[in-house]
UniProtKB/Swiss-Prot annotation:
The lineage of its organism: Eukaryota, Viridiplantae, Streptophyta, Embryophyta, Tracheophyta. This is Probable L-type lectin-domain containing receptor kinase VII.2. Residues 349-624 form the Protein kinase domain. Residues 312-681 are cytoplasmic. It is an enzyme of class 2 (transferase). Its EC number is 2.7.11.1. It is found in: Cell membrane. The gene is LECRK72. Pfam families: Lectin_legB, Pkinase. InterPro entries: ConA-like_dom_sf, Kinase-like_dom_sf, L-type_Lectin-RKs, Legume_lectin_dom, Prot_kinase_dom, Protein_kinase_ATP_BS, Ser/Thr_kinase_AS. Residues 1-23 form the signal peptide. Residues 24-290 are extracellular.
Amino acid sequence: MFSKVSILLFSLASLLLFRSTTGIEFIYNSNFTTTNTLLLGNATVKSPPSILTLTNQTTFSIGRGLYPSRINASSSSASPLPFATSFIFSMAPFKHLSPGHGFAFVFLPFSETSAASSSQHLGLFNFTNNGDPNSRIFAVEFDVFANQEFNDINDNHVGVDVNSLTSVASETAGFYGGRDGQRFTELKLNSGENYQAWIEFNGSAINVTMARASSRKPIRPLISIPLNLTGVLLDDMFVGFTASTGQLVQSHRILSWSFSNSNFSIGDALITRNLPSFKLSGDSVLKSKGFIAGVSSGVVLLVSVIGLLCFYVVRRRRQRLEGDVEDWETEYWPHRVQYKDVLEATKGFSDENMIGYGGNSKVYRGVLEGKEVAVKRIMMSPRESVGATSEFLAEVSSLGRLRHKNIVGLKGWSKKGGESLILIYEYMENGSVDKRIFDCNEMLNWEERMRVIRDLASGMLYLHEGWETKVLHRDIKSSNVLLDKDMNARVGDFGLAKLQNTSKEMVSTTHVVGTAGYMAPELVKTGRASAQTDVYSFGVFVLEVVCGRRPIEEGREGIVEWIWGLMEKDKVVDGLDERIKANGVFVVEEVEMALRIGLLCVHPDPRVRPKMRQVVQILEQGRLVEDGGEREISLLERVKSSYLLETGEGSRQQHPTFQDVWNSSSYSNSFQTYDSILHGR
């Protein structure tokens, strides 16, 4: 039976076996090319966007798309190397044709297709070599045909194959959900819908998981079994995808793909939203009775569209001359919402629709085009409007192009003269983490708190490393981390975010921006933000979530100093939220790990703090990746070593107190107090 122990054992085995390797890592986000992909048979790259298409309507054909060069799949001792791969795929039959066969993710000792057959053999084997132990082929099949000769369980299954199409394990395609991971939902493989798959092999066991694209990775794998691939994965192997057609045909598409020998979080780097859809529509227009009339209507429609375009161009030119359209609008985020529509959506920014406030802004719930949205209204005086507009442009230029499952999406924007600037976000039904910890009857349980920490780490990793330009958030705190309807955490409120070229280390400011208790010592002293100051804020957030205590509370020791003190006494677990202790449902090892991660991140020396990539790997695997190589390391040793923890009171004195911040000459008017989030947003 599946249990959390299974995940713990799998992660522990990964920790023990993931030594420093000469493996590779790559990410294809709808950017397949004939250069970065080896195309065989009927496989092609279709663009735009650049996706890998394995098959077409040709009967009895094979299509393969492989990484262009061999990779090392075993160590010097002949032990198979661990790997993690994730990809987004779509399978769909062609209109008016019966569906065909599936496809497989594969490791092959060769690239050519001469030793493979089409149809039910998926372009992997033929009638003679299927089952041959010398084939040295490993695959995970996604099949939509029930072949009795291979003992297929049904016509919609996922299977793990070793040298044979008779799977060593197979399950109906789908995922496990619910709070206990016991609710199974079947996913129809050949519906044309986009699905994401995760395949993780730690050297002795394999996990296979799938879900709808843009959904969170299910905690419980679809398939989780011990697996010995010694003698199967060789020194030099090809890796990629294969599919075939027979008398029956259908399309097999790979939209995105990531692979790594060392990073189990590689799947988080895939863009899962705004992908092309291949779902089948109704009957073909070519066979409809109104086809001829439709062509005539189409000509009329084309003329109408041309007329509308001309009207649009003239109107835009007039607006630009009148100063209503900013020069940057089209480039960064073209979806401007009319102010009158925003007024209607929020009922005139009524108090009953207000769900949050902070600084010079308020957040309202609204309904635009039938969908709930969160509307952030930033008020300003005429004197402030120029500077505020610049910050507004920074936010639009950042959020308008960022796409990640753990970042709140920007839906549009608006403004009213120099009085107010307006941002329209996705609505987060479950409000802020701040609210769910301190001001809500439905308090976050331990499992949900760990998920929130992992989600925020994933979102911050994307901001720091996952885009062409580094993005500094500059105000990470519990009220800026929001929860969607599925309780997934997302980073919100980019009002203080700055774009940073990767060639530069820091962004200088003339005053401190941030929130008391979350600001790194060097930020308070110099006003200079960096990725390390974001990491510090993340560390404070982790301590806050685990302890159920705000960073600064009147009459109490600051949370950072308090947890450092508990660490010195070897009682760090005593910092756990008393309400969680009373509930009794928590994992001591996870509590200890989370608090130590928090302490790593809030170290007063920014050079000692980990990068967000390292934080993500600690959370996923309990290990650190050092610059220049990977090695196992004890978190306890790292936190308690003399390198990290200076003895006596000297260490604590390096952390800024509330008074330090208040007395800072750079504090001025930019100091932010806690935002209050009353409801979901």
